[in-house]
Structure formats: structure tokens, C-alpha cells
Amino acid sequence: YGLIQTNDDPLHFPSTKLNEYATENVKEFFQHIKLVITIHGYGREHLFHSVLLGGRNRALASHLASFLKIALPDYSFVSDLEEIPKELRGLHPKNPVNIPPLAGVQVELPPTLRWNREEWGWSDNGGIGRAKHVDDIINALSKAIKALPQNIYLNR
């Protein structure tokens, strides 16, 4: 699922509110999956080059970080929950990242990864194309998922 906004109506939608507004399709989606990876954006000046990996599936967070580090060597990847600001950890039980049986990982991307420098705007928004870094993230996450050792992550 995705929450897409236009430039005219930016709104912070707390993840913990999704279930209150979820359609039947979203509710059914969660009945058919074992784990989830959610992608969020955040902005903290002191963390502009840090990708935060929250959520309750810590083994999966470490696995994803190992692939993301290769794809984006200029960024740091924080998977230690104590180093992630409390409100960005993705640990609340109503957060969609924690609904599936194996929970998941909440990937928080800083503005420096979401901003398309060539087109001077936010990636994939209002006619702005996707920034190269966003493609790098997508490709790294795809590789990480394909390399999942299923006996460790999927059968607990």
C-alpha cells in the first residue's frame, strides 16, 4: 500500500492511525503476508546522511542494512534502536510494520536521499522524476529480499 500526497496537501499521517482508516483491501493484504518493509521519510538536521532501520524484526533490519551499505556508501545505516530517535523506531504495536506475524522493518530515509538534485524537487512527486539514490535503495532492497535466508527470517 502507499500513501501518496500532492504538493497542495502535505500532511503527516501517523503510521499508528492506518488501521483506523484502512480499506478492506489493506486489511486483507495484512492477512496474507508474514513480514513487511515500510519506507518513510524523516528530517533531522544532525542525521541528514543517516538511514534509520526501525521496526521489531531486528534480524531483518541488520540484513537490509548490509545491502544498503554497499549501495549507498556515503550514508550511515543505523539499526541499533537506542541510536534511533524514539518516535522513529517503529515499535508501536499499531504501527503497520508490526502487524504481520514476523513484524518487519521501518526504513526512514533522510531528505538528502529523497531530494532529486537534478530536477530540484522531491523524487516521484508532482512531475519530478526519481532521484538516482531512490533507484539505488530500491535495487538494494530487492537484492536483500532475494537473498533472504528463509529458514532464519520466515519460519519463526
PLM region descriptions:
Residues 1-156:
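N-terminal catalytic or cofactor-binding beta/alpha core of small enzyme domains
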